[in-house]
Amino acid sequence: MKLSRIIEGLEYISNAKLDTLDEVEIEGIAYDSRLASENQIFVAIEGETVDGHDYIDKAYERGCRVFVVNRNIKLPEDSVKLLVSCSRSALSKMSNNFFDRPSEKIKVIGVTGTKGKTTISNYLKSVLDESGMNTGVIGTNGIFYNDYEGKTVNTTPESYEIHKTIRKMVDAGVECVAMEVSSGGLMMQRVNDVNFDIGIYTNLSPDHIGPKEHPTFEDYRYCKSQLFKLCKYGIINLDDENSDYMIENADCEIKTFSIEKESDLKATNITLTRSEDSLGAEFDYIEKGETPIHTSISSPGEFSIYNALAVISTCECLDLDKEKYLGALSKAKVDGRVEVLPVLPYATVVVDYAHNGMSLENVLKTLLQYKPNRMICLFGSVGGRTAIRRKELGEVAAELCDVSILTTDNPDDEDPMQIINDIAECFHNSKSEVIKIVDRAEAIQKALEIATDGDMVVIAGKGHEKYQYVNGERVFYDEKGEVINAAARILKKNN
């Protein structure tokens, strides 16, 4: 593709003449010098710990001769320099152009909020697929479409990877993609040039605030709101206290859903259900001026109802067959989200991704409605993040749990025991028994060993993840595998 076509719409200052830009043939875009090669554009991005401008010489050695920079630095004479105000924004626009604006050729649904993004995105894939709309997913659990499964490093990948993935989906016959849109992805302008048809807002709590993420809650909230400047339709949880802010800052048509307030789509008559391998809920929902409709889902709690309402609202926007999408929604499940593992015949074991105070509180309060004999909860907190998350997790467990097993989550380069001790500070006036075990596998073994008839064991924090970050390295770790193996050892010993 000609360079002039790739940089179409980009504001820049260049050392090259216009006819030169028309003549240069480009085969790819690189933003990592290790992946750079001949006939590629190298985009120098200033990251949190690494500055791409420091690796321009490496990209040059690997054959790059076109460089996008946001500092007026000196380059070799045979190089084309494109000076821009923001290289991240430039990468987004160029990636969109390079892959021939793929998001204009597919329905794109963006999901943002502190919690619910993964569940809603995966619900949408299940429901839309069964409704006859071939759908893909980009998010925390990975990239999925047709028979393809791929991994993602970030919840919302870099803009080049997004447009590349959507291009592949379009070429593979995918008609719709549900994408998790994180505040970081919005802040780092990864989705600037994605053509969103629908944006969904779930909720907001003071998470992802700290030196490595958002400096303030106001910045976090602002970044979330930017999705609704990129959409045709916005679907908003009206019960969330920040919903008015999202609506006021939106540039799109808004539809609302709720359980408490009057909205375009409201749930009523909620009841919990239970089977051997599933916890769920039934409810009625009412569209303005319509007759109530009864439906069910295979996940418990109000937060699951909110997720379901977001999916129903989306299906209505897409004008899908009600019978098909409600039938699919009733069966939909998400890996590692309030997932019951039927490993002990006398106790209920649940694995969940809850890793902040708001999520853990929602999960525990929902599960307590099933009136377990004891609530045993295993959890930890990540390293390198604001300490407030540890406090919030600890306070929730101190209030709601009979036994709290504090262990390792993703300690990164922090001392795991220090993180555990920080959480333990919240239990001074609590009736909850506290057990500290650094090794997460050993902690799981302990949690299942102490479980007795009617107890509920919640293993929180990892869910679907197959890794831990320890000492700056990503190491393999399979939460569900550890639970299954621990239970097998216990049952073998008991027999």
Regions inferred by a protein language model and the residue ranges of each:
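N-terminal leader/targeting and accessory segments in enzymes
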Residues: M1-K93, K229, S263, N269-I270, ...
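ATP-dependent carboxylate-amine ligase
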Residues: M1-Y12, E38-I41, N122, D251, ...
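Acidic, Mg2+-coordinating active-site environments of NTP-dependent enzymes
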Residues: G9-L10, K74-D78, A172, M187, ...
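Phosphate-binding loop of NTP-binding sites
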Residues: L10, L91-L238, N242-E253, L309, ...
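Short, hydrophobic beta-strand segments that form beta-sheet elements in well-ordered domains
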Residues: I26-Y31, G63-N70, A178-M179, Y233-L238, ...
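Short glycine-rich anion-binding loops that position phosphate/pyrophosphate groups of nucleotides
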Residues: G47-T49, I73, S183-G184, S205-D207, ...
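Glycine/threonine-rich flexible loop motifs
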Residues: T49, H53-Y55, M188, G210-T216, ...
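Short loop/edge segments at beta-strand edges and connector loops
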Residues: V69-N70, S85, G139, V181, ...
